[in-house]
C-alpha cells in the first residue's frame, strides 16, 4: 500500500523532523554539559543524539518522495544549564513515547499500515528509556550526587581507566591528572 496522501505519511515526516531537531538540540546540550564539567552527561547527550539520528533515518526511508506539507509544533527553546537541558530533553522524550508515537501508531493501524505502527511503537520504547536516563541524571545534578554518593562506590576515570573507591570521585585523577568531570560510577555490564 502506498503512503502517498495518508495521515501516516504526514506523521512519518513530522516524526522525522522532530527526531532530526532533537539530534541537534542534544548536540548543543552536550556542549553545554561538557563546559559545565559533566563529561558523562555530555557523552550521554551525544549518544542519544546518534540514536535520534537512527530513528530519523528509519523514518526517512519509509517515505516515498515528493513534497509533503506538514503543520507541527517544535520546541524553540534556548540552551540552558545542564539541569535545564536534561529536563527539556526528558519532557520531549515523554511526549514522544506517551502521546506522539502511540497516536501515530493508532493512525497507521487505521490506515492498514501495521508494519509502520510497529516501527512507531518500537521507537517509543527507546524514547521511554531516554526519558528515564535524562530524569535520573537531572536528579543527580539537583541533589549534588553526580560526583558524590551516600555509599562507597567504584569511580572510573573516563580518560585513563583509573578506578577509585569512595563516596566521592577524586577532584583530580591521580593517574592522568584529568579533573573530576571525567569520573563516573564504574559499570561492569559485560
Language-model features: locations:
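Non-heme di-metal
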Residues: 1-190
